[in-house]
Amino acid sequence: MMKILFVVLINLCSIGAFADNLKEMEKKMIDQDEQRPEVHESIAIASTETFSGTWPFKARYTDAPGFRMHYVDEGKGEDTLLLLHGEPTWGYLYRQQITSWKQYARVVAPDHMGFGKSATPSSRTYWLQDHIDNLESLVLSLDLNNITLVMHDFGGPVGMGLAARHPDRIKSIVAVNSPTPFGQPDIGERLSANVADSPWFQWIVNAESTGILEEVLGHLDFNILSTLKLNGFVDNSIINETWISAYRAPFPTPAFALGAIGWAKGFAVGKHQFEVPTAAAKNEIMKKPAMAIWGVQDHTLHANHFLPLFEAIFPSGEVHLISEAGHYSLEDSPEEITNLVIEFLRGQKSS
């Protein structure tokens, strides 16, 4: 069964000989399972796990959202960079940025419920509004203000949901290959058009209709690499055993994959509801500095479908296209994105 599940995703990837490398590397990782520490309760990764020093940040936790939510809190200052990951990643996606960005602001990087070092409670639902509620609880418990939202993938709808509820706490917006739904009338139309062009969303819809979605995503421990490749990154040289371990670690069993399953399933069955801002909140957010960064080779969230959403809310916002980056542009072009955000922050201080 595991082999079949893996082949399903590999065939969708259509990446030729690279599939053989995926099979080899993931088989090797599976063979190492006996060496992994036993997980306990509903958190898959030990608080002290650094993944061979690539994640050196102190683990912090809050129970404010009603479950044990992990976040890192680095640097100091009145301004806060709030880093929001997407599917099926965690704060590790920002590991190469945190060290640099914390020199300019306080950096808070939470893991959504069911991802990373956060808990995966079995009694909760994992729809968009749940993730917005959880993020809101974290922000209020830490009393974060002057927030620059840095959002990737579904971190965008979550972050924009926070912005709709608390526009006064938001200083600026950075969307990295991330939708920015904020009451635009054509959101549904653009989502539908994107599905027609996206192998990942086509797979989600088909997998749900054929009843295999939960089975496949429940085994991300085995097929994490092929799933990431289907969503899209360009630089295969980033792949090594530590990298694979970090991204597969949150999902040791199907019980720990509820977050990844929930995000995909919620899209397929229409459970994700975007936060709709009030007129006052929309007017306030539209005045904020904003920047969109997009890896052009993103075949999951296409720039031509989603950049117009950003430009509708932020007509004066900066837009940067990275030609040699895919959906996981933070992996493909980490230095370029790091520097773009630093310049963006400097620009706000000088204005």
Predicted feature residues:
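Flexible "cap/lid" subdomain of the alpha/beta-hydrolase fold that forms the substrate-access gate
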Residues: 21-59, 67-74, 80, 108, ...
